[in-house]
Amino acid sequence: MPYSRDITKFITATEPEVGLPLLALQHSKSIIGVILLVICLLFILIGIIILAVGGHATAGSIFVVLSLILGGGGFFLIYKDNS
């Protein structure tokens, strides 16, 4: 069969139609991770300001918890991308 494709080319992603989207996805994961870390730092700042003003302890705690979740997700994406 002259037109059959070798399955190992798809596994190793050496063909452009397979390899390029995988490279783009890998690059975008690290960009998303950096964006999540920046949002995390912003939420920490907002949470500290809300907690410092007082009277809104629940809202401040929610921002701090959200920042921890987003920061963990961003760090995980960057870590998995570099390993």
Swiss-Prot record:
Q: Where is the protein situated, by its record's location annotation?
A: Virion membrane
Tell me yes or no: is Methyltransferase among this UniProt entry's keywords. no
Protein name per Swiss-Prot or TrEMBL = Transmembrane protein EP84R
GO annotations of cellular component type: membrane; virion membrane
Q: According to the lineage, what is the superkingdom?
A: Viruses
Q: Specify the inducers.
A: Expressed in the late phase of the viral replicative cycle.
On whether Protein biosynthesis is a keyword of this UniProt record, the answer is no
- Transmembrane feature ranges: 31-51, 59-79
State the family it belongs to. Belongs to the asfivirus EP84R family.
Alphabetized UniProt keyword annotations: Late protein, Membrane, Transmembrane, Transmembrane helix, Virion
